[in-house]
Amino acid sequence: MSRSYPGEQVEHAFNSKRLKNWEVPAVDKSQAISTSTGTRFGTLQPRSGRTQFIVDDNGHLKSGVPKLEKSAFNFTQTTPVFMDSAPRWPKENPTWPKNMKATMGYKGIQSNYLPTNTVTLKAVEVPGTTERNFNFM
């Protein structure tokens, strides 16, 4: 047995709620537009002016547009945010072995595609088991 759902039962979640930013406001631009939902922003002033492009079709700055001296991509040595902050990762422990390679599969089962001479896994030698302790480096 099949069920049929009316269109509004499925698609009402996908209907646009506030996508009316392309409409021309009905009031004069000198007046404030009050929000309908009473948000924390109170009344909103309409924006004036227009978007001006600062780059050409190739992505280069147009003439007359000033370059920013400092940005996130060309910071200097005097920037305290990057130079004086604490390191993100701790320093490497010199007592730990450097080349830890696992050549065993799931639960220590020997694999045929990795060599056994590079195993540095820590295991416990249990008498009567077929597992081997390869921690001999």
From Swiss-Prot:
Matching InterPro entries: Fltp
Keyword Isomerase: no
GO cellular component: cytoplasm; cytoskeleton; motile cilium
Domain of life: Eukaryota
Keywords attached to this entry: Cell projection, Cilium, Cytoplasm, Cytoskeleton, Flagellum
Pfam families, alphabetized: CFAP126 (PF22611)
Places the protein is found: Cytoplasm, Cytoskeleton, Flagellum axoneme
Family affiliation: Belongs to the Flattop family.
Purpose: Microtubule inner protein (MIP) part of the dynein-decorated doublet microtubules (DMTs) in cilia axoneme. Acts as a regulator of cilium basal body docking and positioning in mono- and multiciliated cells. Regulates basal body docking and cilia formation in multiciliated lung cells. Regulates kinocilium positioning and stereocilia bundle morphogenesis in the inner ear.
UniProt-listed PANTHER family: PROTEIN FLATTOP
Full protein name: Protein Flattop homolog
